[in-house]
Amino acid sequence: MKKASSIRREVFFTIGKNVINAEGFKKLDEVAAYMKECPEATVTVTGYADRGTGSAKINDRIAARRADIVEAELIKRGVARDRIIKSSKGSRVQPFSDNDMNRVTICIAEDKI
């Protein structure tokens, strides 16, 4: 059976928080498992914050912290730091039309082969 060439997982957060819930940990386990199966893969971790709350400065800080936390959890699960590309968009970019869903860190892992 051919493995997927990429996976995408969203880790959602409560407003103003950077604590990962049980569902988020499950998604990070899936990303880590994919990374172990695909040793040439890299994972892009991008943190976001919703536009509906906080100032741009606060949202930048929250989104960056969310990306940091997700990166740390992937490293704990055996993903090498040099295989993780991390960024944050604050509230400048909104990946979802539903404001509440933009309290998220999106992980996209792609195999290079």
Model-derived features with residue positions:
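Periplasmic peptidoglycan-binding/tethering modules of Gram-negative envelope proteins
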Residues: 1-42, 82, 96, 100-113
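Periplasmic OmpA-like peptidoglycan-binding domain that tethers envelope proteins to the cell wall
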Residues: 25, 48-113
